[in-house]
């Protein structure tokens, strides 16, 4: 079930370095929210705070709150691993497990999180591959290595792996940046389908992509070099690209910087 994310007063650190500062926003369920902004503005860091992946980096910590349908993801006693089951992630470069078959790649998270009969696993793997629009391309070679697929197919395999555990939210960190235009189109079409089931947040440097796939867009920027990233503006995507409220947003979208 897709869930709403409410962020309030979020500041993230890596050791003594303040990466982002005082971010507050809401991500609506069953929608696509795009994060845009120049390199180094903190959009990927912020994305990672939404499922506590930033804590994998030594010294990663936050102040503020992230609520998933009123559940505090940073509350006392909350297991980060359980958070990542609810809030899945797809990374910039396709990263199928290289020694695993296509089937085992999709089933990996399921096996980690519980005990399933083979028939149950087969049913979920098929459903997930169909959900990622990959089933018809791989159904006759499920025992072959996932690393043998094309780049676009590998990324869809990673999406199938992420949705197999039925998360509430799906985070995507530049999921098309390493793909060719045809594969990018396939992923964008898939995002449009997945938002019917999941809350989706995507980081992208491609503003045309943000305009195509998202319902809402958030623009991040730095006040100055060496300063933490900040959320400058968030609104309906159509408004952000046609009539932004902040001059810096218009300057970035029009190509004056970034």
Swiss-Prot record:
ABC transporter domain ranges (all copies): 5-247
Single GO MF descriptor: ATP hydrolysis activity
Entry binding sites for ATP: 37-44
Protein EC: 7.3.2.1
GO biological process, one term: phosphate ion transmembrane transport
SMART domains: AAA
Alphabetic keyword roster: ATP-binding, Cell membrane, Membrane, Nucleotide-binding, Phosphate transport, Translocase, Transport
One GO cellular component term: plasma membrane
Chief location: membrane
Membrane topology: Peripheral membrane protein
Broadest EC class assigned to this enzyme: translocase
One Pfam family per UniProt: ABC_tran
Catalytic activity: phosphate(out) + ATP + H2O = ADP + 2 phosphate(in) + H(+)
InterPro entries for the chain: AAA+_ATPase, ABC_transporter-like_ATP-bd, ABC_transporter-like_CS, P-loop_NTPase, PstB-like
PROSITE patterns membership: ABC_TRANSPORTER_1, ABC_TRANSPORTER_2, PSTB
Localization per Swiss-Prot or TrEMBL: Cell membrane
The protein's role, per its UniProt record: Part of the ABC transporter complex PstSACB involved in phosphate import. Responsible for energy coupling to the transport system.
PANTHER family: ABC TRANSPORTER I FAMILY MEMBER 17 (PTHR43423:SF1)
Family as reported in the entry's similarity comment: Belongs to the ABC transporter superfamily. Phosphate importer (TC 3.A.1.7) family.
The protein's assembly and partners: The complex is composed of two ATP-binding proteins (PstB), two transmembrane proteins (PstC and PstA) and a solute-binding protein (PstS).
Descriptive protein name: Phosphate import ATP-binding protein PstB
Organism: Streptomyces avermitilis (strain ATCC 31267 / DSM 46492 / JCM 5070 / NBRC 14893 / NCIMB 12804 / NRRL 8165 / MA-4680)
């Amino acid at each position: 079930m897709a869930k709403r994310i409410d962020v309030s007063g979020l500041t993230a650190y890596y050791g003594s370095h303040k990466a982002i500062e005082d971010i507050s926003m809401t991500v609506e369920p069953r929608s696509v929210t795009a994060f845009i902004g120049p390199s180094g503005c903190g959009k990927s860091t912020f994305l990672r705070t939404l499922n506590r992946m930033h804590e994998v980096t030594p010294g990663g910590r936050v102040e503020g709150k992230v609520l998933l349908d009123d559940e505090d993801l940073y509350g006392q006693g909350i297991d980060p691993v359980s958070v990542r089951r609810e809030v899945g992630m797809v990374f910039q470069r396709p990263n199928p497990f290289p020694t695993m078959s296509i089937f085992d790649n999709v089933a990996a998270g399921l096996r980690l999180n519980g005990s399933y009969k083979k028939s149950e696993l087969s049913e979920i793997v098929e459903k997930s591959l169909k959900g990622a629009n990959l089933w018809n391309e791989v159904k006759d070679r499920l025992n072959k290595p996932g690393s043998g697929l094309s780049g676009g197919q590998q990324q869809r395999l990673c999406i199938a792996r992420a949705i197999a555990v039925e998360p509430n939210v799906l985070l995507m960190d530049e999921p098309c940046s390493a793909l060719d235009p045809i594969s990018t189109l396939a992923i964008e079409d898939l995002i449009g389908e997945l938002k019917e089931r999941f809350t989706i947040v995507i980081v992208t440097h491609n503003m045309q992509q943000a305009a195509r796939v998202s319902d809402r867009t958030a623009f991040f920027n730095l006040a100055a070099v060496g300063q933490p990233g900040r959320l400058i503006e968030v609104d309906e995507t159509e408004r952000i690209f046609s009539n932004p409220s902040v001059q810096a947003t218009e300057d970035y979208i029009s190509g004056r910087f970034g």
